[in-house]
Amino acid sequence: MLNPKVAYMVWMTCLGLTLPSQAQSNDYRPSYHFTPDQYWMNEPNGLIKIGSTWHLFFQHNPTANVWGNICWGHATSTDLMHWAHKPTAIADENGVEAFTGTAYYDPNNTSGLGDSANPPYLAWFTGYTTSSQTQDQRLAFSVDNGATWTKFQGNPIISTSQEAPHDITGGLESRDPKVFFHRQSGNWIMVLAHGGQDKLSFWTSADTINWTWQSDLKSTSINGLSSDITGWEVPDMFELPVEGTEETTWVVMMTPAEGSPAGGNGVLAITGSFDGKSFTADPVDASTMWLDNGRDFDGALSWVNVPASDGRRIIAAVMNSYGSNPPTTTWKGMLSFPRTLSLKKVGTQQHFVQQPITELDTISTSLQILANQTITPGQTLLSSIRGTALDVRVAFYPDAGSVLSLAVRKGASEQTVIKYTQSDATLSVDRTESGDISYDPAAGGVHTAKLEEDGTGLVSIRVLVDTCSVEVFGGQGEAVISDLIFPSDSSDGLALEVTGGNAVLQSVDVRSVSLE
């Protein structure tokens, strides 16, 4: 038997790939975030729970580490953390790639693609014809609980000629179907994104196959939305309870290509009303509509078919907005850690709030706990802790004018610094010394989000650290910053410090995270 390390080097050489540097021994693969077993991944697709199994589909190139040959990759999990890689679910074939889409259960077999004893699961996706670069909408179905998928023989279900009256490019920019059953109207609803036209279109169907255009949601019809927010993609749509009330509201979530707080792609969400044909947006607040202020939260979608007994709206996105530039050689693209999304009033404003799913607690072990301790300028806490996969929680009362800093993945010349600046109520992530930032002009820098103290003056920060990422949740989850980082293996330290005044640490809990 060939030595595994030698076999790996031979395999890499045969593929023409560069070996990871000695400073990074495992190609930056994360410890507890999902990555494809190899090659390219971008945004998640068709997120659905079937029985006790969570299904993750994702945009995947199964043959190379760059975008292209796009199909639906597939993985399953019973806890959203331990993932089993599965064969390709929806392949690219006959010159048609399988772009982004969504999945849904058809319990009454309205599609006719199953039967009453075994209703089908349906997946809608954009078919991208490489020769013409046109995009149409297609359907696949599963009658074995999502294990395998068959393309509908009558594809496309919305052709480019049908799209053309509602798409000024004639079908070059109609993609990413979000489909769900609208109980109130008794119809199936499809939401399509129209890229550079900065609009969504809404379609209805009685049978999931034959579709009729109903309306457009344009940027000009959303009061308060900046004209700089362009290139709409990857829509999601769902009802969300407003915590503390008996009300629900409709939410549209999407990913503009430009205009996000950190530059480039970002995910925003807007509330409004939906009558089964058209969505009327509430006026937006630029300070609360972005779900993430970091650079690396792109193409978010939510899991559907989650039992009411669970009740959570769980979302995830791809953490990569640099194309094929990141310095990984055997894989590209990783899934953000799944997070819950809810809507509640924080202070005087209504916010979307997000938190890592509670399942994370089952794979974490406490390394150090501090309580009711004052940290003063010149002190450094947590410096004895080492780790590259951590869940760090800090709750503190900052003095006026103080700055609390938590350095993670800290080494001799590398660190990623999470700061809270009391004077302007700002949470920030500083990647300027985070490791390798040479791969892309946008790879370094400082990303910020507003985070007010609560009514008692308390500030809460939670940081998920993994091999090549940080995800920072401030307050109740109203301020979130997600970023990729690429430090050396040896940069595994922590440091908690304060300048400009003291901070009273109500609690500090540092946990190691492991899937093993």
UniProtKB/Swiss-Prot annotation:
One GO cellular component term noted in the UniProt record for this chain: extracellular region
GO MF terms, alphabetically ordered: inulinase activity; sucrose alpha-glucosidase activity
Organism: Aspergillus ficuum
Location(s), subcellular: Secreted
Catalytic reaction equation(s): Endohydrolysis of (2->1)-beta-D-fructosidic linkages in inulin
Effect after changing N42G: Strongly decreases catalytic activity
Disulphide connectivity of cysteines: none
Leader peptide range in chain numbering: 1-23
Similarity field: Belongs to the glycosyl hydrolase 32 family.
The protein, known as: Extracellular endo-inulinase inu2
Binding residues for substrate: M41, N42, E43, N61, D176, N320
EC number(s) stated in the UniProt entry for this protein: 3.2.1.7
Ranges in coiled-coil conformation: none
Function statement: Endo-inulinase involved in utilization of the plant storage polymer inulin, consisting of fructooligosaccharides with a degree of polymerization (DP) value from 2 to 60.
Alphabetized UniProt keyword annotations: Carbohydrate metabolism, Glycoprotein, Glycosidase, Hydrolase, Polysaccharide degradation, Secreted, Signal
Active site: E43
Superkingdom of this protein's organism: Eukaryota
A biological process from GO: sucrose catabolic process
InterPro entries assigned: ConA-like_dom_sf (IPR013320), Glyco_hydro_32 (IPR001362), Glyco_hydro_32_C (IPR013189), Glyco_hydro_32_N (IPR013148), Glyco_hydro_beta-prop_sf (IPR023296)
